[in-house]
Amino acid sequence: MSTLADVSSDITASAAWRKLHDHHGALAQRHLREIFAEDPERGRELTLQVADLHIDYSKHRATRETLQLLVELAREAGVEAHRDAMFAGEHINTSEDRAVGHVALRLPAGRTMTIDGADAGAQVHEVLRRMGEFTDALRSGQWRGATGERIETVVNIGIGGSDLGPVMVHQALRHYADAGITARFVSNVDPADLVAELTGLNPATTLFIVASKTFSTLETLTNATAARRWLVAALGEDAVAKHFVAVSTNAERVSAFGIDTANMFGFWDWVGGRYSVDSAIGLSVMATIGKERFAEFLAGMHAVDTHFATAPLEANAPVLLGLLGIWYANFFGAESRAVLPYSNDLARFPAYLQQLTMESNGKSVRADGTPVTTATGEIFWGEPGTNGQHAFYQLLHQGTRLIPADFIGFARPTDDLPTADGTGSMHDVLMSNLFAQTKVLAFGKTAEEIAAEGTAPNLVPHKVMPGNRPSTTILAPQLTPAVVGQLIALYEHQVFVEGVIWGIDSFDQWGVELGKQQALALAALLTAAEDPAPQDDSSTDALIRWYRAHR
């Protein structure tokens, strides 16, 4: 078995990769209709139950032999060794020499995980205790604003992982908001974002959560400063301490802003932003749903962590789904994956996954600094069903690109209404569409079948549904805090598996840094009194001069 010392080895030169290459050559032209005919029980047998999640991976262009070969690839790449190293707190983020400890954020009380010589579990639960005390005070009305009024709205100011996770989870769990506190979210440095979110708010009943680990993120501090001016204009300077709290580790900057450091909630270098919604970054979520529901959310994540850490690779959901991602990206040439939640409350889930997957695995060098030798990083995108059916499913069904899809649905709705004739459930209509789409994507409809229906010959080729389009279906009883946690962890660990096989560091993001530096350098040129010096390239120079002339 491979060890961490083998991280620099090129998996594309391995025996397992060559076997998959040869196997793909034999399988590529086979249709799912044929695969199901030869293996009629696969629809019942190629499923996994992980906590509340029922996962059907039978509609993939993969035979049982394919799955065996993919598992062999995972073993040769050292997936088990890397997984165990992560759970042991080792520094698997090699470019930054850091541990990767997001799994510690959802450890049950009393469980330990040593990171950098400290008990991460104990550290996490101390922060959770403080978060719980604070949100209890908010929700009960014990915490009052500067005028003595109760807080009714929390506004989370963050960006990237400090925004996408809380926004997504808040929307997904809106039915669990039960204390009269609503949440709004500001991320974009475009002033329209902040202005829109402040519209209609009463400063006396508004609390801001400024989420920035270093308390120096340009977009976040720009928005926070503007929000501070808005508050001070209404309530005065002394009100800041009662209307701002921070999620940060920089006590000096937090204090200078006017926030009492007793109301600063920290997290650690071993938590990446895109893996942080279950840390203090989730404070806005806890404020709306309460600490008990937040604990259920964490327990859902931990349930999938335990499955990932202990299940054999052959029956390990994140491993198999990550391997199928490799199968399509590297052997079929697929470039993207559609994520299609048949739940409007999960509307932001695809955007959340975009950061999780693309910031993690959008790398062109391996962990040892050498160039990758195969495509990396899936492009994730999607919209809720059934909206997408009337927008882009046409390309999924009849286009020339292979786009694997993940369908997510629930047995019981968070809201339901009767159908137009009053005899049925709108949720049943929604779910019938999910099942129909996965069936048609997989099996399609042949020219012979269409002609047999009496279709005009000239229309037959236009109506052919090729099928052979792969998908995973993930079902759960209902969209609960635990299930949201399970879904997040399921995808987190898929990303991990893919990154290990590609030999890349899935936990850094150096690609975002240069743009930040360039923006700071260019900002002064946009408003300078004198004409700026010419830029290195004529395009940027001309754009800056156009902007200056028209602002």
Curated annotation (Swiss-Prot):
The record's catalysed reaction(s) read: alpha-D-glucose 6-phosphate = beta-D-fructose 6-phosphate
Which of UniProt's keywords are assigned here?
Answer: Cytoplasm, Gluconeogenesis, Glycolysis, Isomerase
**Single GO biological process annotation from the record:** glucose 6-phosphate metabolic process
InterPro entries from the UniProt entry? G6P_Isomerase, G6P_Isomerase_C, Phosphoglucose_isomerase_CS, SIS_dom_sf, SIS_PGI_1, SIS_PGI_2
Keyword presence, Cytoplasm: yes
Signal peptide region: none
The record's similarity note reads: Belongs to the GPI family.
Task of the protein: Catalyzes the reversible isomerization of glucose-6-phosphate to fructose-6-phosphate.
- What is the protein name stated in its UniProt record? Glucose-6-phosphate isomerase
Q: Which organism is it from?
A: Nocardia farcinica (strain IFM 10152)
